[in-house]
Amino acid sequence: DTIEAIGEKDFPAWFDLPCEEAQCTRIADYILDEDPYPLKALIGFGLNHRMWPEPEHFQKALKALDFYVNVDLFFSDSSKMADLVLPAASSFERDVVLNGRGGMFFLSEKAIEPVGEAKNDIEIMIGMLRAMQLHDEALEHGYEKYMEYILEPSGVTLEELRAHPEGVKGRVIIPPAFKRYEKEGFHTPSGKVEFVSQILERYKDSHGYSGLPEYRDFREVSGMDREAYPLILNTGSRKPQLFHARTYRVPWLAGLEKATLVEIHPEDAKKYGIADGDMVRVSSPVGSICGIAAVYLNSQPGIVHVYHGNAKGEANDLIDRNYLDPISGFPGYKSYFCKIEKEKGEVKA
């Protein structure tokens, strides 16, 4: 019998699309509830529980596992909970095949040997594959053969790339295809543009999906008390000095901001009696964090923006883990509900 994929019972339309990935946004619940079946072990590659809404709930799920392994460059908080931590080699410690514009291929050779027991992620996968006596065309013959496997369609060999660090142009170049739909159709059950989605219609009775595009304002369907939480919380945008959680490990980059910045529009600052640099508290139905107000003209009135990844004030602590898009299953990182108020005292760095 075919085993039900993780997320399939909650977001079935995801699996009817041309997608080969499980939907893991609710994996913490699946682990803790043992539904649709018990999940006893997990192997993560760079797993960071703080990237999920209500990260403490995910942390609880990791602790409930019988066996948990994390492969990472850093001894992160998620790694500290693991039964086994496998150190990953950095990009300076591994050979990697790259392709560039114009059909060019390159070999990025390691600058140094892996430090300590660090290994390439793929080599770790190959080791697990062999230990479990599994077979995979791309991986089972080792890392060198894996890179050759990647290159094979191009007609370029690994030996050529080693001899030509400037790169080698692929001999088999697949030109851009135009109007592929005329021969292959679209990725829909009918192969046509569907004004009424057959996939969504399939789950109309079981999940309430509508085959026709239907606008539903999230502010009205959430059931949220808008008087208590009148502002919209936005997170996940970019900052030039930060890249997700990883750059918070670099003290001089993290130190550019004394604490978590809470960006608000001048109109909201005036409305709530907040000045630039004030200590504020942002609260939602599931949590609250403190930060420093940054009155920001380029933001929208009614929107509060908090950057993610800062363990000292994590934006995802504010987002309900059940606030998910009903079709795709992705969390509403851009549109949850909050309030803001001035806090007494000073923010500790």
Regions found by a protein language model. Name each.
Residues 18-21, 118-122, 126:
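Electropositive phosphate-/nucleotide-binding environments in soluble metabolic enzymes
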Residues 97-98, 105, 112, 161, ...:
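Short clusters of hydrophobic/aromatic residues that line enzyme substrate/ligand-binding pockets
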Residues 83:
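Catalytic, metal-anchored helix/loop core of enzyme active sites in primary metabolism
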